[in-house]
């Protein structure tokens, strides 16, 4: 998908179009995992926009459990990218007005949460879109 913003001059500006083509959505995370298969050893399927936002933000399960929103990242051990991201989303930051990042995101639209989630992931590695999903390469 493409993202846009309106600048201070009131001009619509194309911001980004780095995305996975098409994407396949599933009703449940289990259905998505069955279709995608194993994320790899010491890895987990990570939702760029968190699963809890189905309830917190009223987002569709087809958008959340979608190949556009899932990426395989290191997980299962202390200090993994997955544990660092989970910790960050549970933390309170200066911009969250006393809320956790997770709560602060609640109610924001999918595209806003998606761009935020990508930026969080990109602190730990590079995200490359393919025709079938994202590839995450962790910084060494």
Please report, for each region that a protein language model flagged, where it lies by residue.
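Catalytic toxin/effector domains delivered as secreted proteins or via bacterial secretion systems
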Residues: 17-140
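Autoprocessing domains of the Hint superfamily
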Residues: 1-21
